[in-house]
Amino acid sequence: NDQLRFNRAELLEWATARNLDVSPDLFAREESSHALLPTVSQALADGGIVYGVPGGDRAAVLHAVVSVMKLPAEVDHDELCQVLLARECLGSTGIGDGIAIPHVRNPLVLHVTQPTITLCFLASPIDFHALDGKPVNTLFTLISPTVKTHLHLLSWLSYALRNPAFKEAIKRQAPRDELMLRLAAAEAAVDR
């Protein structure tokens, strides 16, 4: 048939990893309603912000991250760690500037009902094999119930990370309240 087809999730991950400026609306389908999809602020409020997460390598850090995540009781923590590590083997989720966005390749694997983003600041930076070669000290771990929600949150998070005030607050590991205010301002700066 000589047609090229691209997976939306893989395309967004590729663009995010290369720090390309991608509008969140690019991945929205016309029939979708943004009113029904959560904001990054909502997902982060549900997932939480954790400081001083230990670990000397990707595996140890991901185990520590999963242990502090607010997950439903039926989610197997060891299985989630394995899925996140398998995703890292396909290609690092380290997007540069000390930030990684670990997430499962297929959101439906976990069977969760509520999307969450857990922001973890590491006790010490680690090599996450990021494209820019810099060690990672900040992880936004994304868990979604559907591919649509996954793409929505991943694209909006990638967009928010381009906001200078939000990014600066992340770099200095600002207090929770300030981070949430900066994120809300970054989201509000874009016409939804």
Language-model features: locations:
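Cytosolic covalent-transfer regions centered on His/Cys nucleophiles
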Residues: N1-R192
